Amino acid sequence: MIVLDTNVVSESMRPRPDASVRAWMDAQIPSELHTTAINEAELRIGVALLPKGNRRKDLLLAINTALARHFADRIVAFDSAAAVALADIVEHRRTIGRPISQFDAQIAAICKARGATLATRNVADFADIGLKLINPWSAP
């Protein structure tokens, strides 16, 4: 299982996604690509905070379409196993002097609880957690 972080999902929705990201995604088995409910929330919050108008409506439609088309049954929820992992991640990152944002900690916890790889551009944000990370912008 590969979990796509918000920046990867967002990039894939662009009219002209980065060539490296597109090539990396095309090389993956679609059924292995997932995202989380936390990533969905980040996307929806980003749109909800935009001024009302056509751009906001168009982006919301694009998110709804992308999630339904590409992740219909592959949006991973935050569950009890993730809650246990979350506590460990937050404690560890504070102990080493590198606090982590709540959303990133929740995404990392979901991945850790399921043994999933995380695909993200922000690899530094998820360092020192013990996750396998892939940066599609620089993947071979």
Question: Which residues fall in each region the model found?
Answer:
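Residues at the C-termini of beta-strands that transition into short coil/loop
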Residues: A37-N39, D79, W137-P140
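Active-site neighborhoods of divalent-metal-dependent phosphate/nucleic-acid chemistry enzymes
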Residues: I45-P51, R69-A119
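Short, well-structured N-terminal submotif of metal-dependent ribonuclease cores
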Residues: M1-T36, A48-A66, P140
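Residues that scaffold the ATP/ADP-binding catalytic core of kinase and kinase-like folds
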Residues: E11-S12, W24, G46, L86-I89, ...
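Active-site phosphate/pyrophosphate-handling residues
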Residues: N7, S20, V84, Q106, ...
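Short, structured coil segments at secondary-structure junctions
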Residues: I29, F71, I129-G130
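Acidic, PIN/NYN-like endoribonuclease modules and their adjacent C-terminal/linker elements
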Residues: M1, Q106-P140
